[in-house]
Design a protein with these regions (language model features):
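Small/aliphatic-rich secondary-structure junction motif
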Residues: 1-17, 41-50
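Short secondary-structure boundary segments
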Residues: 5-8, 77-79, 108
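Intrinsically disordered or low-complexity boundary/linker segments at protein termini
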Residues: 11-15, 73, 98-108
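Short, well-ordered secondary-structure micro-motifs
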Residues: 13-16, 63-64, 86-87
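A short acidic, glycine-rich active-site loop
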Residues: 20-33
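Short beta->alpha linker loops
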Residues: 30, 53-57, 79
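Structural beta-alpha unit
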Residues: 40-74
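Glycine-rich, Arg-bearing micro-motifs that act as flexible, cationic patches
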Residues: 76-98
Length: 108
């Protein structure tokens, strides 16, 4: 099992110096906190797994990691954006479905 939490960053933040070490540390801590419940469930089941907090565009990063790790499937939550948010932000799940080579299962 490979679990990732992807903290969305924009390339222009890097270029503009807006993502300093303090900001990246905060994002990593947020990702660790966000993944705590999922890790607890997998721990309780006695399964082994890898967990990492990554940075970038979530859909692209998830699809890339799945390919690099030769995952046979992807299971991810469907956050449920409002129509307006979806229009402006897009859907991570939709992007993963488009890019991933493995089957994608969405959990509500």
């Amino acid at each position: 099992i490979v679990m990732v939490n992807v903290q969305q960053t924009l390339e222009r933040w890097y270029a503009g110096g807006l993502l300093n070490n303090e900001a990246l540390t905060h994002l990593r801590q947020q990702g660790e906190a966000d993944g705590a419940k999922a890790r607890a469930l997998v721990d309780a089941a006695g399964l082994t797994y890898e967990f990492d907090v990554l940075f970038g565009q979530p859909g692209e990063v998830i699809a890339r990691v799945a390919k690099e790790q030769s995952c046979i499937g992807i299971v991810m939550g469907a956050r449920g954006l409002s129509d307006l948010d979806h229009l402006f932000l897009g859907s991570t799940a939709h992007k993963v479905i488009q890019l991933a080579e493995a089957p994608v299962t969405l959990v509500k």
